[in-house]
Design a protein with these regions (language model features):
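N-terminal beta-alpha lobe that positions the nucleotide/phosphoryl donor
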Residues: 1-44
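ATP-dependent carboxylate/acyl-activation modules
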Residues: 27-32, 36-212
Length: 212
């Protein structure tokens, strides 16, 4: 800029740098503010500051004409995608709706099916295949194009059964080698390994027009 403009900078350039500088200082202050709210058990402070790092920009928002972005308090999301095309905004909504349920199930073999952030079926059985089939039986029509979330490491027999239905995303606490080989035959199917994902009790923020 200095060379290009004979030792000076444009107003547009200075405004851009100001935006970067104030964003960084505000981000730092927000972390401190939220920390003190937390240790003082202030659940609903008079002013709430939201902060996060830009993680990803999905192709579009809830609808094709809308934009969206994914932010996280961490430098990356603790969500490991191991196969398939890019996650969409709606995929993220469905994934966390499914995980909210599956991560809260007992440590038995549980399966959750979600479509448009609504549960279509939930089941706990003695083996993986029974668990999935029981969850699917709750609403087999709505399950088409939905998301399956399992609280166990997936094996071959369930993978073969899942491949019979069109699904957007499959989530599990890991996949064995044979299950991965089978599921990866569908190049667009998104596979999520949620083994290390820990769910905590959190406040949920809902936007209404420009309000929260």
């Amino acid at each position: 800029q200095l060379i290009k403009n004979n030792g000076s900078t444009t107003l547009e350039f200075r405004e851009k740098l100001s935006s970067v500088a104030f964003t960084e200082t505000a981000y730092y202050d927000a972390i401190i503010s939220n920390y003190f709210n937390k240790i003082s058990s202030t659940l609903f402070p008079t002013k709430k500051i939201f902060y996060g790092n830009l993680i990803e920009k999905p192709r579009y928002g809830e609808n094709p004409h809308q934009q969206s972005a994914i932010y996280s308090k961490n430098l990356r999301m603790n969500l490991k995608q191991i196969h398939g095309k890019q996650l969409s905004y709606n995929n993220y909504n469905d994934i966390f709706a499914a995980l909210t349920i599956s991560k809260s199930l007992p440590k038995d073999i549980g399966t959750v099916i979600v479509k448009h952030a609504n549960p279509c079926g939930v089941s706990i059985k003695k083996n993986q295949l029974e668990s999935y089939k029981s969850a699917l039986a709750c609403d087999p029509v709505s399950a088409f194009g939905g998301i399956v979330s399992c609280n166990f490491k997936m094996t071959k027999n369930l993978a073969l059964e899942l491949n019979k239905l069109f699904l957007e995303v499959i989530i599990a606490n890991g996949f064995d080698t044979n299950a991965l080989k089978i599921l990866k035959t569908k190049k667009n199917l998104r596979l999520i390994d949620a083994t290390d994902l820990v769910f905590k009790e959190i406040l949920r923020f809902t936007s209404v027009n420009e309000e929260i």
